Every structure is written in C-alpha cells, then in structure tokens.
Design a protein with these regions (language model features):
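A conserved, positively charged/aromatic
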Residues: 133-150
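Structural beta-sheet core signal
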Residues: 9, 37-39, 103, 126, ...
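Active-site proximal beta-strand in glycosyltransferases
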Residues: 116-130
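N-terminal subdomain of nucleotide-sugar transferases
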Residues: 1-43
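Short N-terminal targeting/anchoring amphipathic segment
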Residues: 91-107
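A nucleotide-sugar donor-handling region in carbohydrate enzymes
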Residues: 44-46, 148-185
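An aromatic- and histidine-rich active-site surface loop
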Residues: 102-119
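Conserved nucleotide-sugar phosphate-binding/catalytic loop shared by glycosyltransferases and other
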Residues: 35-81, 88
C-alpha cells in the first residue's frame, strides 16, 4: 500500500465532535487516508465531563491531547489558555506531520490551531465559515480562521457569498450543507 494522506481533525468540545463524527468515521474507513485526532479545549476540562472519552468510546484513537489550562472565563485567562494551546498544537503538529488539518466553527480554543497551520504552512480546511453570530467574539474568530484557511466548507450559499466578499476564492469554497443535519449519531 502506498502513502496515505494524514488528515488531522481537531475537536475542542462535544458540540463540534457531534458534527465531525461522520467525517471522522469516513476518514477512518478510507483506504487512502490516515485519520489523526487532536482533542483540546473543553474536552479536557473536568467540570465539563472530560468529554474526550466520548471520542474514545466511539472507537477513535486520540493521537494528542492538548490542554488549554484555562483558569477562568476572563479575557486574560482566555488569552493565556490560547497561548498554552498554541504551543501544544505546534508540538502535536511536529509529531504528527499532517497533510491537512480540519477544524469546525468559531470557538476560541480552535483558533490557535488555525494560527499554527498558517505559520507552519499546513493546509487548513475550515467547516462552517462565513456565518454570523452578532454581538459575540465568535465572529472575529470565525472570520480570522476563514482568512487563514485554504479550503472552506460552508452550510449555505449565503455563507459562501460572504466568504467571497471577504476575498476568499470561489474555487476554494464548497457548500456541503449543515453537518448538524448530517452528523446526528
């Protein structure tokens, strides 16, 4: 068997994992692809239930666990947690050497992965870009991730058009519909 492209999916919470599950299952079953999983963020926080165990219970192997060590919900604590996570993600990428990284959404705890892929020149696919959640920090993070991404998988043509208006190339954007509809396990 020849080289299998290494596809690294980063999951930070039960919410994104439920959407990513069918994609992860498809990659795992593929003869051409090698699934890598990094669990981070809320998955690794005791008060949120250590939900990385759900991934393992679904018979997926987690290649790396990258804690953010967030202490509080203050802005300073979030920034410190993101810095810690950025360092951990860089170490994970140097070990795993992924050919493509896939992230979903707009959470602050996946933003460090997008930054790392950009600096390390690892192609990044972003799922659910182009969306808007007015009045919260999510929009800035989501749009920043979209600007760092090489491939975009959006839920509607409206979101595709928003990415195009932000300067993303039409050929790099695919409307796949909502993974929330597809992903119910």
């Amino acid at each position: 068997m020849g080289y299998k492209n290494k596809i690294c999916i980063i999951s930070s919470s039960r919410a994104d994992y439920n959407h990513l599950y069918p994609l992860m299952l498809g990659i795992k079953k593929s003869k051409e692809l090698d699934l890598q999983i990094i669990a981070t963020g809320m998955h690794l926080i005791r008060k949120h239930g250590m939900t990385y165990k759900e991934i393992e219970n679904d018979n997926f192997f987690i290649d790396c666990k990258v804690p953010s060590k967030q202490k509080t919900t203050s802005a300073n604590s979030l920034v410190e947690a993101m810095a810690t996570e950025l360092k951990g993600i860089a170490v994970a990428f140097s070990q795993l050497k992924p050919d493509l990284v896939i992230i979903l959404g707009d959470r602050y705890d996946i933003f460090p992965a997008a930054i790392a892929t950009h600096i390390l020149q690892i192609p990044l696919a972003h799922i659910h870009g182009g969306e808007v959640t007015s009045g919260v920090i999510d929009d800035g993070i989501r749009h920043s991730i979209s600007k760092l991404a090489n491939l975009h998988f959006v839920a509607t043509n409206e979101f595709k058009n928003r990415l195009i208006s932000m300067g993303e190339e039409n050929k790099s954007i695919v409307n796949i519909g909502s993974l929330a509809v597809q992903g119910n396990k």
